[in-house]
Amino acid sequence: MGIRSYRPYTPGTREASVSDFAEITKTEPEKSLTTYKHSRQGRNNRGVITSRHRGGGHKRLYRIVDFRRDKHNIPAKVAAIEYDPNRNARIALLFYKDGEKRYILAPAGITVGTMVVSGENAPFEVGNALPLARIPLGTDVHNIELTPGKGGQMVRAAGGSAQVVAKEGDYVTLRLPSKEVRMVRKECYATIGRVGNVEDRNIKLGKAGRTRHLGQRPHVRGSVMNPVDHPHGGGEGRAPIGRSGPVTPWGKPALGAKTRNKKKQSSKLIVRRRTR
């Protein structure tokens, strides 16, 4: 992909940029692989806001993406590379030899006509899914399972990749994009290569309207609120927090405080915690 920058014709286009969508080969989604997903606007089943700063945005059709890659030993041809409004990565439409169609995350470098396959004996090529035990050290992988057969849960964002750094016993050690080093069962599947749309991180939205179009609402600072609304609020003018450290609207430590449950069973699989 490439990025197209705007000239400062208006304040909204100054410093703004957009993807050129050069890799997109099909504009309409596959109807059999789409479904309508009602926007929750950050509310739970009682209508209470549980995730702030969400709402509005353009309506979306959800694309059913195959994260399991459980159609083993059946080759598939990449029929199209498509845009997916539900994620920053592109998706690839696969036509399997037996006639089935599926979407997968489009790896970087994959093109229309490429053949991909999943399985224990799949060739070592970009887009193929194999158990971690079969993947050589130093390989970049994405869409990684945490539980065998559950489907990929890690490294699915645009441009993301993890690296296989060690193998010992029943576990394979991975270095994740967050710099966390973690062990995963060797039976878990992962896809060779990194996720496509690598330049997405360099796109600048340029104005508030584009952010609202994505379904994100304003993120108001607590220091400009009233004391009734936030622990940071109140005071005359630009007042300091008035506490030993920043907190959330509900009084919990924020901005750097570790929130992971120390009793979580999977903590023993983390060799080195993430740095940020």
From Swiss-Prot:
Q: Which Gene3D superfamilies match?
A: 2.30.30.30, Nucleic acid-binding proteins, Ribosomal protein L2, domain 3
Pfam family example for this protein?
Ribosomal_L2
Q: Which UniProt keywords apply?
A: Ribonucleoprotein, Ribosomal protein, RNA-binding, rRNA-binding
BP term (GO), one = translation
Segments for region (Disordered): 29-55, 219-276
User: Which InterPro entries does UniProt cross-reference here?
Assistant: NA-bd_OB-fold, Rib_uL2_dom2, Ribosomal_uL2, Ribosomal_uL2_bac/org-type, Ribosomal_uL2_C, Ribosomal_uL2_CS, Ribosomal_uL2_dom3, Ribosomal_uL2_RNA-bd_dom
Q: SUPFAM superfamilies, per this entry?
A: Nucleic acid-binding proteins, Translation proteins SH3-like domain
Q: Where is the composition biased (Basic residues)?
A: 259-276
What are this entry's molecular-function GO terms? rRNA binding; structural constituent of ribosome; transferase activity
What are the record's GO terms for cellular component?
large ribosomal subunit
Q: Which family does it belong to?
A: Belongs to the universal ribosomal protein uL2 family.
Task: Describe its partners and assembly state.
Answer: Part of the 50S ribosomal subunit. Forms a bridge to the 30S subunit in the 70S ribosome.
- Free-text function comment from the UniProt entry: One of the primary rRNA binding proteins. Required for association of the 30S and 50S subunits to form the 70S ribosome, for tRNA binding and peptide bond formation. It has been suggested to have peptidyltransferase activity; this is somewhat controversial. Makes several contacts with the 16S rRNA in the 70S ribosome.
The name on file for this protein is Large ribosomal subunit protein uL2
Q: Organism, per UniProt?
A: Rippkaea orientalis (strain PCC 8801 / RF-1)
